[in-house]
């Protein structure tokens, strides 16, 4: 992503070192993207890599069948590649001994917001937000834990009373319409307005909508107009718009 130029320099430097050390006769290409949020979706990312506008593709065919340049494509998150190294070095049994029964292993959680020591926390899969707050030194002085985003901008918002829910895919988190996604945890306090947080998130999605699907393109703007009225939200209309956006947009 173009927002992180220093990381691109670092990656290219390390690739040269690895190829020289291991004498690898393979090509590793680092493609620079414009930073569109939608390119986190695998087919949109492939479109961007091909030099086209980052728009999600209709499925089927799936990228495993017809991906980059119409070839079957394996798309991995960098975190998957990171943990593969540990599994190879230390064994699968040791790795799976961490975490919960349904979600073994470890994860890297990016914790930001109203904590004393924000940053990346390596913790067992299925850790709770209360546990992560403790690993970050607790809440900032003068701040009381009020709510949190369990999975970045699109993962939903949960109150502090749900702070003991395991943060991983499916399970209890999904029952509340939330997901852990990128494991980007944002901690909110009693000093934050949740209405302002919701408005800020929707403004982000309006800006980052690729515009390909009308329900998303128009729906984000409509939702913003509704929640700007902080005194009273039309919850029924919000739910209707959200359902249409989810059902009638390619990303879902």
Language-model segments: what does each one mean?
Residues 125-142:
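Short amphipathic, charge-patterned alpha-helical segments
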Residues 1, 141-146, 220:
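Glycine-rich phosphate/pyrophosphate-binding loops
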Residues 40, 132-133, 213, 251:
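Buried hydrophobic positions in well-ordered alpha/beta secondary-structure cores of metabolic enzymes
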Residues 2-6, 33-36, 72, 120-124, ...:
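Alpha-helix capping and helix-loop boundary segments enriched in small/acidic/polar residues
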Residues 48-60, 161-179:
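Active-site loop ensemble at the mouth of alpha/beta enzyme cores that anchors a bound cofactor
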Residues 10-125, 137:
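Hydrophobic alpha-helical positions that pack around
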Residues 13-26, 166-252:
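Ferredoxin-type iron-sulfur electron-transfer modules in oxidoreductases and energy-metabolism complexes
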Residues 3-38, 146-164, 171:
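Small-residue-enriched alpha-helical segments and adjacent helix-cap loops
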């Amino acid at each position: 992503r173009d927002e992180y130029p220093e990381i691109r320099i670092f990656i290219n430097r390390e690739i040269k070192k690895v190829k020289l050390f291991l004498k690898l006769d393979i090509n590793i290409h680092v493609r620079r993207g414009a930073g569109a949020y939608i390119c986190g979706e695998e087919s949109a990312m492939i479109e961007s890599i091909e030099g086209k506008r980052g728009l999600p593709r209709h499925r089927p065919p799936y990228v495993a069948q017809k991906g980059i340049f119409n070839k079957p494509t394996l798309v991995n998150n960098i975190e998957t590649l990171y943990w593969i190294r540990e599994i190879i070095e230390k064994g699968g049994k040791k790795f799976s001994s961490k975490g919960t029964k349904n979600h073994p292993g470890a994860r890297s959680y990016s914790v930001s917001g109203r904590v004393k020591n924000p940053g990346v926390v390596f913790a067992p899969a299925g850790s709770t937000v209360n546990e992560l707050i403790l690993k970050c030194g607790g809440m900032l002085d003068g701040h009381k834990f009020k709510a949190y985003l369990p999975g970045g901008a699109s993962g939903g918002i949960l109150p502090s009373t749900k702070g003991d829910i395991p943060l991983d895919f499916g399970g209890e988190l999904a029952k509340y319409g939330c997901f852990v996604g990128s494991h980007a945890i944002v901690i909110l306090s009693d000093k934050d307005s949740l209405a302002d947080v919701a408005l800020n998130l929707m403004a982000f999605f309006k800006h980052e909508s690729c515009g390909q699907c009308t329900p998303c393109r128009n729906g984000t703007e409509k939702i913003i107009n509704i929640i700007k009225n902080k005194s009273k939200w039309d919850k029924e209309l919000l739910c209707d718009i959200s359902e249409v956006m989810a059902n009638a947009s390619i990303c879902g």
